[in-house]
């Protein structure tokens, strides 16, 4: 009996509709030139890690719940006396999502988390890096449905970087608009 493989909703939509729309808009010569999502990197910097070394572990547990994948604890590369940071001190957590988990996270981010952000007026359309990647920040991690608001003792912020295979910002912006990213006008 053949095993049925799960395919995320947004990936099905990309294959069925978004690729054709981008091909029509930019008229690529080759199908492999059509931009697609490469990876999503989520980073949590924990500023309070200098006072309490257990904070990055707590942040990593929350990040694991949000991403559905075990994060890596990040360490300081060098000492900074002004911030009371020593070399190799744990200062945050990060996770890189690819494949099905990436599409599932993107679905939750766009349809559930971003509408729950307080005073949200849309994403900044200038947050592209010039090479087709988009970066954004979220100030409170409780906007994700996986986090129980009653059990949270501290709010964490996070950086979310969406990496695409697009070569220009216009191509990446068109790709993310097709995925319903709410860019402000």
UniProtKB/Swiss-Prot annotation:
Pfam families listed in its UniProt record: Ribosomal_L5, Ribosomal_L5_C
Signal peptide region: none
PROSITE patterns, per the entry: RIBOSOMAL_L5
Gene Ontology biological process terms in this record: translation
NCBIfam families, A to Z: PRK00010.1
Function noted in UniProt: This is one of the proteins that bind and probably mediate the attachment of the 5S RNA into the large ribosomal subunit, where it forms part of the central protuberance. In the 70S ribosome it contacts protein S13 of the 30S subunit (bridge B1b), connecting the 2 subunits; this bridge is implicated in subunit movement. Contacts the P site tRNA; the 5S rRNA and some of its associated proteins might help stabilize positioning of ribosome-bound tRNAs.
Name of this protein: Large ribosomal subunit protein uL5
Organism of this sequence: Rhizobium rhizogenes (strain K84 / ATCC BAA-868) (Agrobacterium radiobacter)
Gene: rplE
């Amino acid at each position: 009996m053949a095993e049925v493989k799960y395919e995320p909703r947004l990936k099905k939509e990309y294959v069925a509709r978004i690729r054709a729309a981008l091909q029509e808009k930019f008229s690529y010569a080759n199908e492999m030139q059509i931009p697609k999502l490469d990876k999503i990197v989520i980073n949590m910097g924990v500023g309070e890690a200098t006072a309490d070394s257990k904070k990055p572990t707590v942040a990593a547990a929350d990040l694991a719940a949000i991403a559905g994948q075990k994060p890596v604890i990040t360490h300081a590369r060098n000492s900074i006396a002004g911030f009371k940071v020593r070399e190799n001190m744990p200062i945050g957590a990060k996770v890189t999502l690819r494949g099905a988990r990436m599409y599932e996270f993107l679905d939750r981010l766009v349809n559930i988390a971003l509408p729950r952000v307080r005073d949200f007026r849309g994403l900044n359309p200038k947050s592209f890096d010039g090479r087709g990647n988009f970066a954004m920040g979220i100030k409170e991690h409780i906007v994700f449905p996986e986090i129980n608001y009653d059990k949270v003792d501290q709010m964490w912020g996070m950086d979310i970087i969406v990496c695409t295979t697009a070569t220009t910002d216009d191509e990446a912006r068109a790709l993310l608009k097709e995925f319903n990213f709410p860019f402000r006008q």
